[in-house]
């Protein structure tokens, strides 16, 4: 390898400086668990004192869920060329059921490792992979079913609770009752509850043993609704440095997991850079890379090529694989009369292979072989919906639901091997058909976590599909979907840039939070209540900081009221100083307090005073000035 830093390493270092700013008004804190090395990160939002006019009380800081890793902690020196610290390495080693290999097992991986032409784009540090010992199963589901609470399970329990016990103000704890549609929402998440949910298959904790840098998180309908962000280069756009930047950008704004969907050059090297710098689980669609290995000719794919790809990616540390094993030969003709046919890339690849060979999908016939690989590294299944509808006209048809039934069959098979599994879902579905999708998934797949792309609720808004899909995402999240895959404004139009990623994440953070509110997730409303209180008290900076995107909120406010003095003003540019509803309400309260009457009496008295004033001035609707 070259001794001097490569151009890519230099780019990575400059990126390090661009993505390490703390989120405005916040600081990173850590909540310790039962052991010294179990430190759960959260974002603490500092709040200012209520103005004397409104009571003058202190407003304690508020802790919120944080996905940004060390990138928003100014105390941590970030070097993307070195990667993140291996947070979970000791926990993995302590279990004694894995061993470090002396090299890569994948033939493709070994070939890349010894190709000097790739030195310029290779991740600098060499790391030896781990694998389960002979006969061992190292999945979190396997441990859970044996009654073991792992450090990872304790970690996510602390994380899910978000220090709600520190919120003592009853007005902030106020929350509307939810409608959970049969979900087992807990008032407090315990490590034992986490273990039970994973053991039952109702939740997954995606943590490959070769991704020790990841901060444990959980996906399940009885936990906070999560979101996924997609990144990845293509043959015509983006490079490694840009994808690493998009990773860090995604998690800064709230991406709980990230899928690398790269299909262009250097897929292997791009993925290594991403995983080594990711504090969140990374997912992939292995068939994309397998297709590259046969120069894009789907009919030339083989089980051996795909198997080698799975091992290659598992040894890099991919946490979950999208596997399109439910695209069966008999389902392909059912798509013939669809408006948009098969729109899933993975689904179309496997459909073409099935038709070319007139054989059953080799991902289906080799499914138990895949399970053997998954449980040797603790890679979770994300069973792909290769026949998802690509327009609302095709929603809930025989092809889509036939595949879903097969995914239910495969889920039960994966569970026999203690392999963690979630199910991917649509797609394009009008609002009135969304609940049918959720109900059928719960029924067919034994309550395994549902992971949906939207769904988009209308097809008429290219350029705004982050909105059309967030509508469906909020609904299906409320009905029980555990993780929502974001859609950006560029959906159907092009590869998203950094701003598109941010817009998509914001739309989906809103949808996920709205779903948590509707389900009645404990503490979900605390942040809403805190922001509403700040808004009523004209604490502008607190309003910005409590929002999902503090920078955007401040930017919009400052377009019209940029001065520091405006941060203390009792109005904004929407209504101005004389028509602010909240200022008027406060005036009514002040009048009531001064005159010793109720607010209702104050309003009545005020109306009488204004009536007398109107008559005294001549009772004319319009007066000459």
Curated annotation (Swiss-Prot):
Pathway: Cofactor biosynthesis; thiamine diphosphate biosynthesis
Any GO MF annotation of the entry: 4 iron, 4 sulfur cluster binding
Species this chain originates from: Xanthomonas axonopodis pv. citri (strain 306)
Sites where the protein binds [4Fe-4S] cluster: 572, 575, 580
Family per similarity comment: Belongs to the ThiC family.
Binding site for substrate: 230, 259, 288, 324, 344-346, 385-388, 424, 451
Protein name in UniProt: Phosphomethylpyrimidine synthase
GO cellular component, one term: cytosol
GO biological process annotation, one example: thiamine diphosphate biosynthetic process
């Amino acid at each position: 390898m070259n001794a001097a830093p490569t151009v890519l390493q230099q780019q990575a270092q400059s990126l390090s400086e661009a993505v390490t700013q703390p989120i405005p008004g916040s600081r990173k804190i850590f909540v310790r668990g039962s052991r010294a090395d179990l430190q759960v990160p959260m974002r603490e939002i500092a709040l200012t004192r209520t103005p004397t006019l409104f009571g003058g009380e202190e407003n304690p800081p508020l802790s919120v869920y944080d996905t940004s890793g060390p990138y928003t902690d100014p105390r941590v020196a970030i070097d993307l060329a070195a990667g993140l610290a291996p947070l979970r390495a000791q926990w993995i080693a302590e279990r004694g059921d894995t061993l470090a290999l002396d090299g890569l097992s994948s033939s493709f991986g070994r070939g890349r490792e010894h190709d000097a032409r790739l030195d310029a784009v290779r991740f600098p540090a060499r790391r030896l992979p781990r694998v389960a010992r002979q006969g061992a199963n190292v999945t979190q589901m396997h441990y859970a079913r044996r009654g073991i609470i792992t450090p990872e399970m304790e970690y996510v329990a602390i994380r899910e609770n978000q220090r709600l016990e520190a919120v003592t103000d009853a007005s902030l704890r106020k929350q509307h009752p939810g409608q959970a549609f049969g979900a087992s929402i807990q008032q407090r998440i315990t490590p034992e509850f986490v273990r039970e949910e994973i053991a039952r298959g109702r939740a997954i904790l995606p943590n490959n043993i070769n991704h020790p840098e990841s901060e444990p998180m959980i996906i399940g309908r009885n936990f906070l609704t999560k979101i996924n962000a997609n990144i990845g280069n293509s043959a015509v756009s983006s490079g490694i440095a840009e994808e690493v930047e998009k990773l860090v950008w995604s998690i800064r704004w709230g991406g709980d997991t990230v899928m690398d969907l790269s299909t262009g050059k250097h897929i292997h090297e791009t993925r290594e850079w991403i995983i080594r710098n990711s504090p969140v689980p990374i997912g992939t669609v292995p068939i994309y890379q397998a297709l590259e290995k046969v120069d894009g000719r789907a009919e030339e794919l083989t089980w051996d090529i795909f198997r080698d790809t799975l091992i290659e990616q598992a040894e890099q540390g991919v946490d979950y694989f999208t596997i399109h094993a439910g695209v069966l030969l008999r389902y392909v003709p059912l798509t013939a009369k669809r408006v948009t046919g098969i729109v899933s890339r993975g689904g179309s690849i496997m459909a073409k292979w099935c038709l070319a060979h007139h054989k059953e999908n080799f991902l289906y016939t080799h499914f138990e072989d895949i399970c053997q690989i998954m449980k040797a590294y603790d890679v979770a299944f994300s069973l792909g919906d290769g026949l998802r509808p690509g327009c609302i006209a095709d929603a809930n048809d025989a092809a889509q639901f036939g595949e879903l039934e097969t995914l239910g069959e495969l889920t039960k098979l994966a569970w026999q091997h203690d392999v963690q599994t979630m199910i991917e879902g649509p797609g394009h579905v009008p609002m009135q058909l969304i609940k049918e999708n959720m109900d059928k998934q719960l029924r067919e797949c034994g309550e395994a976590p549902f992971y949906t792309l939207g769904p988009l609720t209308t097809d008429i808004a290219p350029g705004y599909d982050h909105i059309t899909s967030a509508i469906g995402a909020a609904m299906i999240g409320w009905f029980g979907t555990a993780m929502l895959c974001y859609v950006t404004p560029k959906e159907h139009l092009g590869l998203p840039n950094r701003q598109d990623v941010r817009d998509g994440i914001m739309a989906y953070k809103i949808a996920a939070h709205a779903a948590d509110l509707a389900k009645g997730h404990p503490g979900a409303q605390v942040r809403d209540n805190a922001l509403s209180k700040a808004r009523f008290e004209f604490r502008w900076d607190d309003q910005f900081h409590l929002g999902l995107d503090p920078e955007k909120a401040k930017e919009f406010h400052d377009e019209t009221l940029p001065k520091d003095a405006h941060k203390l003003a009792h109005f904004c540019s929407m209504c101005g100083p004389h028509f602010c509803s909240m200022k008027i309400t406060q005036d009514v309260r002040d009048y009531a307090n001064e005159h010793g009457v109720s607010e209702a009496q104050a309003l009545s008295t005020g109306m009488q005073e204004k009536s007398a004033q109107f008559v005294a001035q001549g009772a004319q609707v319009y007066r000459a000035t």
